[in-house]
Regions:
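Alpha-helical scaffold domains
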Residues: 1-201
Length: 201
């Protein structure tokens, strides 16, 4: 089946599960897409399970200005063909925290260069990149623990400290979440974070 035919088939499945109430609620929360079907994540994952991971299909889905297509793309994108420059392109096109969270969970945390991207984005001046950087660190701490060299640890703490002093609530919350996950990795990390918070970060 051609990619365009597969996408038409996927959209027909989306229409079956369309939820107008959720769609309207998401728009009221500020999500801006050409189309929002209002389908919840478990159902999108069920649809994803019906297809083999496919780079061309995932890239075509990502180009659609449709919420569910972009989320599905993250589940169907093979890791091995998702190069760092493509990750940067996707990151530039993520404009809300919902999509950032889903893409991070489904794809970015599995990338072999995930930690490099996390540090790159945490140091960005773009708020959504900073948010993604901390969300990615949260996932990496959960998956891999707090194994970092001293330089990386110091950089993470410095970036988190700066973010905690930010007036941007989403950045601050993402940094706090990453710090909490880091603290859960061991007594040393817990004490380090507690000292940071006590100091008024």
């Amino acid at each position: 089946m051609e990619i365009n035919e597969v996408i038409r088939e996927i959209k027909s499945k989306f229409r079956l599960f369309m939820n107008g109430v959720i769609s309207q609620s998401l728009r009221e929360k500020g999500l801006q897409y050409r189309l929002i079907f209002g389908i919840e994540l478990p159902r999108i994952k069920e649809i994803a399970a019906q297809y083999e991971p496919n780079h061309e299909l995932a890239q075509a889905l990502w180009k659609e200005d449709i919420r569910e297509c972009k989320i599905l793309a993250a589940y169907l994108q093979p890791v091995e063909s998702f190069y760092p420059e493509i990750a940067d392109i996707w990151m530039e096109q993520i404009h809300n925290t919902e999509l950032a969270d889903y893409v991070c969970m489904a794809l970015f945390r599995r990338l072999p260069y995930a930690s490099q991207k996390a540090f790159q984005w945490m140091a960005s001046e773009n708020r959504m990149e900073v948010y993604m950087g901390f969300r990615l660190m949260t996932h990496l701490f959960a998956l891999l623990g707090a194994e970092m060299n001293e330089r990386s640890r110091d950089e993470f703490i410095d970036q988190a400290t700066a973010a905690m002093r930010s007036d941007d609530l989403i950045v601050k919350q993402a940094a706090l979440s990453a710090l909490e996950r880091y603290a859960s990795c061991g007594e040393e990390q817990s004490a380090e974070v507690q000292h940071l918070l006590d100091a008024g970060a």
